[in-house]
């Protein structure tokens, strides 16, 4: 295991909240879950795990930004997709954390992600220049990832030249390591910690899961 994420041992992180939220019908960053905005909930969960948190927001993203967490916009105009947020995260991390080799990204729409996310992704680095990606139940969660800053220029070129700009396809271009996370035990059965909340219906389901979670479950 190689830990070269930062001088302090903790990596910088960026919450990806710059999407259109078209399926939700309103900005996901400002949507309430359990009386908290999704953005507040994600930041609260992420804060103990990382050295710093910025939020990738664009003009349409909405939501009040918690104090102490800078907003960063895509560096490539035209909303070219989530990889633009990853690139913005890499560029920001290079500026604010000169000793860091990686940046962690977390999407706004999965509020139950593990409290061990950052530590386990960091611990999975072998050579030190891989992308560490979260998995659960046999599925990749490509935006829950630890990205090496050294591949920022390649990502910039990929976004500008590849028509589809698929996150999984970009990951396949580089060395990566998969980190599998178990389901969470709840009173209502197992919960995928990367449960996605993209629609009003999924938000209702997330509220139900929140009510069922055992105090020690996550």
Curated annotation (Swiss-Prot):
As cofactor, the record names:
Mg(2+)
Family matches, as InterPro entries: MobA-like_NTP_Trfase, Molybde_CF_guanTrfase, Nucleotide-diphossugar_trans
- EC number(s) for this protein? 2.7.7.77
Q: Which SUPFAM superfamilies has this protein been placed in?
A: Nucleotide-diphospho-sugar transferases
Q: List the disulfide bonds.
A: none
Q: Which family does it belong to?
A: Belongs to the MobA family.
- Protein role: Transfers a GMP moiety from GTP to Mo-molybdopterin (Mo-MPT) cofactor (Moco or molybdenum cofactor) to form Mo-molybdopterin guanine dinucleotide (Mo-MGD) cofactor.
Checking PANTHER family in the record gives: MOLYBDENUM COFACTOR GUANYLYLTRANSFERASE
Q: What is this protein called?
A: Molybdenum cofactor guanylyltransferase
Organism per entry:
Sinorhizobium fredii (strain NBRC 101917 / NGR234)
Gene name of this polypeptide: mobA
């Amino acid at each position: 295991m190689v830990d070269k994420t930062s001088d302090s041992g903790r990596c910088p992180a960026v919450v990806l909240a710059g999407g259109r939220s078209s399926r939700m019908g309103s900005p996901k960053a400002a949507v309430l879950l359990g009386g908290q905005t999704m953005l507040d909930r994600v930041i609260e969960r992420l804060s103990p795990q990382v050295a710093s948190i910025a939020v990738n927001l664009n003009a349409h993203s909405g939501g009040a930004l918690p104090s102490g967490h800078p907003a960063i916009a895509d560096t490539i105009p035209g909303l070219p997709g989530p990889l633009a947020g990853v690139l913005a995260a890499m560029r920001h991390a290079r500026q604010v954390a000169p000793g860091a080799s990686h940046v962690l990204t977390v999407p706004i729409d999965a509020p139950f992600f593990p409290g061990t996310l950052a530590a386990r992704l960091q611990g999975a680095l072998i050579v030190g220049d891989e992308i560490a990606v979260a998995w659960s139940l046999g599925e990749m969660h490509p935006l829950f990832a630890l990205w090496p800053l050294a591949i920022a220029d390649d990502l910039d070129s990929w976004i500008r030249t590849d028509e589809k700009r698929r996150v999984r396809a970009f990951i396949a271009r580089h060395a990566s390591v998969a980190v599998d996370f178990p389901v969470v035990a709840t009173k209502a059965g197992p919960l995928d910690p990367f449960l996605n909340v993209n629609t009003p219906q999924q938000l209702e389901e997330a509220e139900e899961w929140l009510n069922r979670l055992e105090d020690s479950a996550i």
